[in-house]
Regions:
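Feature captures the catalytic cores and cofactor-binding loops of soluble hydro-lyases/lyases
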Residues: 1-131
Length: 131
């Protein structure tokens, strides 16, 4: 994101940005019902890098799938560009554990601007204390 544009977004409210998008024909460009884990962070800003989860089949999605380095969740964590916000679209399913403290820490080390989910996080008590 260009620095001059970033400075504008840093001072604009979410409502203002949503209205501007709406005027451009982009409706429903936000996720409802979100709340920050860390209440001390006032604003998170970055381009979106989105991963969409689909419901897992318990007969096919065994724990071994997470050992695969090409698992979509791992790929997203490694490919999310610096200064982007990783968005986990979990279809508003809190049982879809989007990530835990290890992956969130990895994203932080890689320079990710933040993480958003409409699902759940494992280790949320640890994630909210990650600096």
């Amino acid at each position: 994101m260009k620095q001059n544009i970033k400075k504008i977004y840093e001072i604009a409210s979410v409502a203002t940005i949503c209205t501007a998008l709406f005027k451009k024909g982009l409706k429903n460009q936000f996720i409802q019902g979100l709340s920050p884990l860390n209440k001390n962070i006032s604003k998170m800003l970055g381009l979106a890098y989105t991963v969409r989860y689909i419901p897992a089949r318990e007969d096919l999605n065994l724990i071994d799938v997470f050992k695969d380095p090409n698992h979509p969740q791992r790929v997203a964590v490694e490919e999310c560009p610096r200064d982007y916000v990783l968005i986990f679209d979990s279809r508003k399913n809190p049982r879809a554990a989007s990530a835990g403290s290890i992956l969130i820490t990895r994203l932080m080390v890689r320079g990710c601007a933040g993480v958003v989910t409409d699902g759940g996080f494992r280790d949320s008590h640890e994630i909210k204390n990650i600096n």
